[in-house]
Amino acid sequence: MAFSTNGSEEIELYHAQIHLYKHVYNFVSSMALKSAMELGIADVIHNHGKPITLPELASALKLHPSKVGILYRFLRLLTHNGFFAKTTVPSQNGKDGEEEEETAYALTPPSKLLVKGKPTCLASIVRGALHPSSLDMWRSSEKWFKEDKELTLFESATGESFWDFLNKDSESGTLSMFQEAMAADSQMFKLALKECRHVFEGLESLVDVGGGTGGVTKLIHEEFPHLKCTVFDQPQVVGNLSGNENLKFVGGDMFKSIPPADAVLLKWVLHDWNDELSLKILKNSKEAISGKGKEGKVIIIDISIDEASGDRELTELQLDYDLVMLTMFNGKEREKKEWEKLISDAGFSSYKITPICGFKSLIEVFP
């Protein structure tokens, strides 16, 4: 029996409790999603070719019979969160002459992003974001706040930078996992490329700074095969990669110099760094495009936070990303006014911001 109350203070208190508990237990939704990804639930439903019943799914996943009820409860939460959809299908257990139906589960747009082998699969993003190294550091946040040291939370918790962690043990697979996650995210850019073709039209050369294994550059090269593209990253990242006549891989240090080109692409780069280091990258980018005169440009793909957008889910994601960048790299996601100052301080004359990819922006910067 529910308690009744006419007091607004009590009602406010109950709503406050719900709000608090929801955020405290948000990790459960994240971990349930991680479990679904690791089990390959989306793959099974996709390969099934139609909505799948709970017994069929449990059988395909080779679960112990005692876990069928547990699977149902996981699916109940994930369905509530929009990752699966419930429907009904004719029951295989119906008696002769009787039509019976049972519940079945179908993919939704978010869970389709977990189907492995698809160009838009983001399973590696889930795996990387929820990796123990990304989560365990938060246990040290109280100590970190009280330290008089310029360390990231990751460094304070582990004793090493995230980049050192990635590179120290190639056999652990953490570097390849990170590169796979970045490549998966880059595939989403293919959808946006159709809308921003004009940004690359008229260019003869492009250097993708911090371009990793070249996921984005290859997409651009497919659309503009005449464009001479260079993927510029750390030597250990690009050292064993090969391209072709119009696509090459070059190792180096973006804080020292950047290969010359008509345009410099900085996708998911500047948010890794604080303003001082981002300014150095932008100044080196300006120098790299100087040979093109006023027709050169820098193309930034990053988040531009707009708390006044009215889209709470979008803004929350952007603010979450900001804390990820802060705690792991001492980087930041920037508001429009912060982008404006950074671009101006680097000596550029103008810029243009265009929202793309749902929660990111494409920022064209002109000398």
Swiss-Prot record:
Induction pattern: Up-regulated by elicitor.
GO molecular function: 2,7,4'-trihydroxyisoflavanone-4'-O-methyltransferase activity; isoflavone 4'-O-methyltransferase activity; O-methyltransferase activity; protein dimerization activity
Coiled coil: none
EC number(s) given by UniProt: 2.1.1.46, 2.1.1.212
SUPFAM superfamilies, A to Z: S-adenosyl-L-methionine-dependent methyltransferases, Winged helix' DNA-binding domain
Enzyme class at the top of the EC tree: transferase
GO terms classed as biological process: isoflavonoid phytoalexin biosynthetic process; methylation
Entry annotation: catalytic residues: H271
InterPro entries: COMT-like (IPR016461), O_MeTrfase_dom (IPR001077), Plant_O-MeTrfase_dimerisation (IPR012967), SAM-dependent_MTases_sf (IPR029063), WH-like_DNA-bd_sf (IPR036388), WH_DNA-bd_sf (IPR036390)
Reaction catalysed by this enzyme: a 4'-hydroxyisoflavone + S-adenosyl-L-methionine = a 4'-methoxyisoflavone + S-adenosyl-L-homocysteine + H(+); (2R,3S)-2,4',7-trihydroxyisoflavanone + S-adenosyl-L-methionine = (2R,3S)-2,7-dihydroxy-4'-methoxyisoflavanone + S-adenosyl-L-homocysteine + H(+)
Keywords (A to Z) from UniProt: Methyltransferase, S-adenosyl-L-methionine, Transferase
Residues annotated for S-adenosyl-L-methionine binding in this entry: V209, G210, G211, G212, D233, Q234, D253, M254, K267
Role according to the record: 2-hydroxyisoflavanone 4'-O-methyltransferase involved in the biosynthesis of formononetin. Can use 2,7,4'-trihydroxyisoflavanone, (+)-6a-hydroxymaackiain or medicarpin as substrate, but not daidzein or (-)-6a-hydroxymaackiain.
PANTHER family: O-METHYLTRANSFERASE
Family as reported in the entry's similarity comment: Belongs to the class I-like SAM-binding methyltransferase superfamily. Cation-independent O-methyltransferase family. COMT subfamily.
Protein name from the UniProt record: Isoflavone 4'-O-methyltransferase
Lineage: Eukaryota, Viridiplantae, Streptophyta, Embryophyta, Tracheophyta
